[in-house]
C-alpha cells in the first residue's frame, strides 16, 4: 500500500480539474484527431496520425499519474489550521539575514510545488528548516548552494 502524501485542498482541486479536462475535452479532441488522420489513408507514413497517437499516449499516461496522485493524497484543508508554529500548509514570510530580502513561501505537497508561485515542497531543505519554527525564530537552511540564514517574520494559513 502506498503511503499517504500530504496535499492542500487547493492542490487536490487543481489536480481533479486537470483530470476531468483530460478525460473529457482532451481525450475527445485527440480521438477526433486520430479519426481525421486515419481518413487520410496510409498510416505508415501519416505524420498526423503518429502525432495524434503520441498525444493520446501522453494524455493517458498523465491521467494514470493524476489518478495515482489523488488516490495516495492525504488532503489537508489548511483554512482550518491555526498554529503559531510552521506546519504543512503554512504561508511563511521570511527575511534573508544576509541580503535583508523578504520572501513568502507556501509549504505544500511535493506534487504542488512551484517555486515561481512561492510554493515549496514539504520535503525541500527550506521547508524542512522551517517546520516547527515560530515568528521571530531564525532558520538555518543547508542547501547545495551553501548554508543560508532566515528570520521568520509572519505565519499565516
UniProtKB/Swiss-Prot annotation:
Q: State if Transcription regulation is listed as a keyword.
A: yes
Q: Which InterPro entries match?
A: GreA/GreB_C_sf, TF_GreA/GreB_CS, Tscrpt_elong_fac_GreA, Tscrpt_elong_fac_GreA/B, Tscrpt_elong_fac_GreA/B_C, Tscrpt_elong_fac_GreA/B_fam, Tscrpt_elong_fac_GreA/B_N, Tscrpt_elong_fac_GreA/B_N_sf
- Enumerate the transmembrane spans: none
Give start-end ranges for the coiled-coil region(s): 9-30
Q: Name one GO biological process term.
A: regulation of DNA-templated transcription elongation
DNA-binding recorded as keyword: yes
- Tell me one GO molecular function of this protein: RNA polymerase binding
Record key words, sorted: Coiled coil, DNA-binding, Transcription, Transcription regulation
What does the protein in this record do? Answer: Necessary for efficient RNA polymerase transcription elongation past template-encoded arresting sites. The arresting sites in DNA have the property of trapping a certain fraction of elongating RNA polymerases that pass through, resulting in locked ternary complexes. Cleavage of the nascent transcript by cleavage factors such as GreA or GreB allows the resumption of elongation from the new 3'terminus. GreA releases sequences of 2 to 3 nucleotides.
The family line of this record is: Belongs to the GreA/GreB family.
Q: What is this protein called?
A: Transcription elongation factor GreA
Biological source species: Magnetococcus marinus (strain ATCC BAA-1437 / JCM 17883 / MC-1)
Amino acid at each position: 500500500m502506498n503511503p499517504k502524501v500530504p496535499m492542500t485542498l487547493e492542490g487536490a482541486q487543481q489536480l481533479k480539474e486537470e483530470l476531468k479536462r483530460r478525460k473529457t475535452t482532451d481525450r475527445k479532441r485527440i480521438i477526433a484527431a486520430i479519426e481525421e488522420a486515419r481518413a487520410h489513408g496510409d498510416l505508415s507514413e501519416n505524420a498526423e496520425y503518429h502525432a495524434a497517437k503520441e498525444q493520446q499516449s501522453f494524455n493517458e499516461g498523465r491521467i494514470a499519474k493524476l489518478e495515482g496522485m489523488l488516490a495516495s493524497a492525504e488532503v489537508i484543508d489548511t483554512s482550518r489550521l491555526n498554529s503559531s508554529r510552521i506546519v504543512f500548509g503554512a504561508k511563511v514570510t521570511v527575511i534573508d539575514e544576509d541580503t535583508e530580502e523578504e520572501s513568502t513561501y507556501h509549504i505544500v505537497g511535493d506534487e504542488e510545488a512551484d517555486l515561481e508561485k512561492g510554493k515549496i515542497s514539504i520535503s525541500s531543505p527550506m521547508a524542512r528548516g522551517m517546520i516547527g519554527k515560530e515568528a521571530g525564530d531564525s532558520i538555518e537552511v543547508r542547501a547545495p548552494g551553501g548554508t543560508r540564514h532566515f528570520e521568520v517574520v509572519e505565519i499565516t494559513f
